Amino acid sequence: MNLWDNMLRGKEATLAGIIRVIIEEEPETQDEIAEKLGISRRYVAKLLKPLIDEKIVRHPYIVDMSKLHKINLEFDEYILMKEIKTTLEKMEKTLLNNLDLVYTALKNSDKKLAEDIIIKDYALNKMEEEVRILLSMNALKYLPGAYANALATIASNLERLGDYIANIAEEVVHGLKLDKDIENEVNMIFTLLKEMLTEAIDVVKSKKKETKIHELEEKLHKNLELLLNKVLENKREDLNFYVQFGMFLKDIERFGDRCVNIVDIALELYHNIPRNPIPERLKRGML
């Protein structure tokens, strides 16, 4: 266990306060920091020493945020990340609820419920804007540029997931009905979508490196293929059904792709694992 690990466990709040004062007040001496926080200069010196030794803090008291995050990525929780993660969790909860609702609307051909889902989508737009406002107000002070850009992109991806759910709801409003004999397949697909979303947000929150997102993605596409084949076996004269069903499949596929994209963004941010520049659908040889 290094000095950082030992120190942060009991003195995180004071250390965060010191860093905040350095960033916001630009003090020239440790006495100024101590006076601002109501603690002794000796205590300030003790907490700052490891940061100065690692060149994370330089005199006259400038913080190298990139080094701070490399040494202790959990430090960002103390200042800004907690607020942003709370908003991302709210977006996840809204999306999971809307997935359940749109599945019910699809299963029961419930146009009124589908219309309500479309209206609910605006809540996700507001949450994405909330993240962007938080970042625009604070990111330059407390987060490296890579964090701000990645978190804004993750919030944008979550908002787009809401759009795909709203698109499915619109197809229900326009008359999309699925046969009873494919209910099990459709139920499995929505279960996988919820698992993929939950996994994506977990990677963002926990910063874990190992993820099952690609395994879930593979299961999703196998189930989509099974569903498509089953639908094509039951030939219909209504061409409009195939158009609507095709749009439904496309939105499901895009939902899964966005979940993978969120994980890729998080892995690049936290672990420097480069993202594949080729979109998921093109990697599968599909346009």
Swiss-Prot record:
GO terms of biological process kind: intracellular phosphate ion homeostasis; negative regulation of phosphate metabolic process
Pfam entry (one): HTH_24
InterPro entries: P_transport_PhoU, PhoU-like_sf, PhoU_dom, WH_DNA-bd_sf
Top-rank taxon, per record: Archaea
UniProt-recorded name of the protein: Uncharacterized protein MJ1641
Organism encoding this protein: Methanocaldococcus jannaschii (strain ATCC 43067 / DSM 2661 / JAL-1 / JCM 10045 / NBRC 100440)
